[in-house]
A protein has these predicted regions:
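A conserved beta-strand element that flanks and buttresses the S-adenosyl-L-methionine
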Residues: 97
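Conserved N-terminal segment of class I S-adenosyl-L-methionine
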Residues: 1-84, 243
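Acceptor-substrate binding/catalytic loop of class I
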Residues: 164-183
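Short conserved loop adjoining the S-adenosyl-L-methionine
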Residues: 85-90
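A C-terminal cap/extension of S-adenosyl-L-methionine-dependent methyltransferases
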Residues: 183, 187, 191-252
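A short glycine-rich, Lys/Arg-flanked "PGG" loop and its adjoining helix->strand segment in the class I
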Residues: 109-124
Length: 252
């Protein structure tokens, strides 16, 4: 577990919002990511489109109808929510979006049970998380403050005395990679249909410096960088840095 407090995490959210306003290149790249998410939303279902752990709520720039939630009551958040104990009624949500959130779920089984409760039949969970290719291992392992967590056991369910209101800040950036790129957890995912597991190469994002690192190329170079992404995307084991996962709640 990463040894920082929830309060420190909220400070980072505030900092990220400032970086977002100062880095138009980052805005353009994130809109590409948000459009990938939008392409996988099931718009045929009635119900809310809800983002869990919205942070700065920038998803609304592409999906304005998204209901943005977070642990912290920042002014741009629609509703305060905890992934382990959602306030939404049963089967009231059509799509749940988790952008850089899955790797913060210390007990994914508990969260999935709650997601199953609030999602309509055939409702979707759309997960966008780090992908740990060779490049991803270098980038996230050496240049990011959150651990990859490959040496840690994934605890699917919380202990019996678990209090969802009182838990530490958890991060293991490799968890989506470990869970969705193998068959090891298929039994745990029995209630879900795996619609998509897509490896995304985004050197354009890595070289942008993200929120807090130095930007290594000007915004005008973005089309060229996207071309590089497309070329290197043929070798996801080496270069993929993002993982897009779409799960669908089984109707029976």
């Amino acid at each position: 577990m990463l040894n920082i407090t929830e309060e420190q995490h909220n400070i980072e959210i505030q900092q990220n919002l400032r970086y977002w306003k100062k880095k138009p290149l980052l805005t353009k790249i994130y809109k590409i990511f948000y459009n990938l998410i939008k392409e996988n939303i099931n718009f045929s279902l009635d119900g809310l489109i809800v983002e869990i752990g919205s942070g700065t709520a920038n998803l609304k720039s592409i999906i304005p109808q998204a209901w943005c939630t977070d642990l912290f009551p920042n002014t741009w958040i629609d509703q305060v929510e905890n992934a382990y104990h959602l306030s939404f009624p049963k089967e009231s949500i059509s799509n749940l979006i988790l952008f850089d959130v899955w790797h913060h779920l210390q007990y994914p089984g508990n969260a999935l049970n709650e997601f199953k409760r609030v999602l309509k039949p055939n409702g979707r969970i759309i997960i966008f998380d780090p992908d740990i290719s060779l490049l991803g291992f270098i980038v996230y392992g050496l240049f990011h403050h959150e651990p990859i967590g490959y040496g840690q056991e994934i605890k699917w369910f919380a202990p019996e005395n678990f209090n969802y209101k009182d838990f530490g800040y958890y991060a293991a950036q490799g968890n989506a990679n470990r869970i969705f790129k193998s068959n090891k957890y298929d039994e745990m995912l029995y209630d879900w249909k795996r619609i998509l597991v897509k490896h995304i190469t985004s050197i354009s994002y890595v070289a942008s410096g993200g929120y807090s690192k130095p930007q290594l190329y000007p915004k005008s170079f973005l089309p060229f960088m996207i071309f590089i992404d497309q070329l290197l995307g043929k070798f996801p084991v080496l270069f993929a840095t993002r993982l897009l996962v779409v799960l669908e709640k089984k109707s029976n």
